[in-house]
Structures are given as C-alpha cells and as structure tokens.
Amino acid sequence: FDNEGHLFVTMGDRSSAQFRDRAQDLDSHIGTIVRINPDGSIPDDNPFVGQGDALPEIWAYGVRNVQAAALHPETGALWEIEHGPRGGDELNIIEPGANYGWPVVTFGVEYSGGTIGEGISSAPGMIDPIYQWTPVIAPSGMTFYAGDIFEEWQGNLFVGGLASTALVRLELDGNR
C-alpha cells in the first residue's frame, strides 16, 4: 500500500513465450502493475482511466516477472525487481503509465540462447532499468534499510538473490 492507501499488485507474463507479447497490450493484465483502492475500485487518477482500449487499473506495463516491490521510504516511489530470462534481471522505479519494455527490449536471451523481441536493450518510449544483473542473481526480495545500527547504510537497497545465494547491498545515489 502506498501512503494514500492504494494497493499495488504485480502481474507477470507467466514466464511463457505464448503470453509474453501481451505485456505490451493495455487490454491485458499480463506483464503489468495495477493500482487499486482497498475496496477494489479504480483510483480516478490512474494513468489509463478513461482510455477506452486500456484497463483502467493498470499503473505500468511491460514488466516480465516481478519478484519484489517496495516503496522508497523518503520519496514514496514504487521500486521493483524482476527476473530476466537468461540474463537481464532488472531494478526499476515504477512511474504511472510507463512502459518498461518487456519483451521488446531486454538484457536477457532465451534459455535456448536465441534472441528475445528485437534483440535490443533500449528503445524510445520505453524506460530503461536503473540497474540490471547479467549474469542473473534471480532476485527474490528487497527492502530499503532504515535502521539505526548501520547508519552508513541508511537508504541503501538490499536484494536477495536465489541463483547467487547472496544478499546484495546497493548503495543508492538518489535514483541511481
């Protein structure tokens, strides 16, 4: 829940080549992050409210397989991490109405080694991740440090890694 009480829900692409292209379609929940009120209604200020060809609950789209999300303790911005395929795990700051590119752009490749999408990692109109891991760490959770014991870690982001069996600390400089 954000500071205004809205609930964010992430919807992946089911890790399926059959469904992945739907992450670019605003009439599908696949590959999206939705924002709703606690009673299930749609906030009036969601970016696609009133756009006839889009589901109004969609907050952002073009994500692959979100594994964790957290609100930045100072800015309230929604951050998320997602599994890439073979390479290209991502850390993103989610903006309303933004397209994060999956599967058109990715730093990863098919598990078979083939190209995904257009074989590019950036494109106009699509938001680049603020950080990506290749090889993958298979992120499994994240939190911003707000404790008192390690003052120099204040605001740092901690990410668990399944494949790396590691806890990764990212020292942030603003949104980087």
Task: Tell what function each PLM region has.
Residues 4, 13-176:
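Beta-propeller domain segments
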